[in-house]
Regions:
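Chalcogenol-based redox active-site neighborhoods
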Residues: 1-151
Length: 151
């Protein structure tokens, strides 16, 4: 399978987290600078409106207060556009009931990455995988912006 897609290597544990500016469902961010002094969990999902991604987001949102108590900021990412994200998050809040969770409001930022710049910067676009969806990845970034764990 041939592709002309430029694919970047995933940063490694111990590397400084790559910095970027992005539009999110909570406004513009400068990552990781806007969350200085906090732990950060940057996680990607392949697509809005899919069952597994929906259950993951509902679970993260349902437990957000626990992350905040640990001085940790959640930040989601996919290569879907902002309007798709907004519609999906509205659907989650208004229509989805999952394992007793309903009326779940996702208030952490969800990054619009239609250019795939952030996904490429973090190595979320993989050879042999979809050229229009980021693979699932989770980055745990410490308060000094160093990547400590990658899942």
């Amino acid at each position: 399978m041939e592709t002309n897609q430029n694919i970047s290597a995933m940063p490694r544990i111990g590397d400084k987290a790559p910095s970027f500016k992005a539009v999110t469902t909570q406004g513009d961010i400068n990552f990781p600078e806007d969350y200085a002094g906090k732990w950060k969990i940057l996680f990607s999902h392949p697509a809005d409106f899919t069952p597994v991604c929906t259950s993951e987001f509902m679970t993260f949102a349902n437990r957000q207060a626990e992350f905040e108590a640990l001085n940790c900021q959640l930040v989601g990412l996919s290569v879907d556009g902002l309007y798709s994200h907004i519609a999906w998050l509205r659907t989650i809040k208004e229509k989805i009931n999952y394992k007793g969770m309903k009326n779940v409001e996702v208030t952490f930022p969800l990054i619009e990455d239609i250019t795939m710049n952030v996904a490429n910067m973090y190595g979320m676009m993989q050879p042999g995988e979809s050229t229009t969806k980021a693979v699932r990845a989770v980055f745990f970034i410490d308060p000094n912006d160093i990547i400590r764990t990658i899942i």
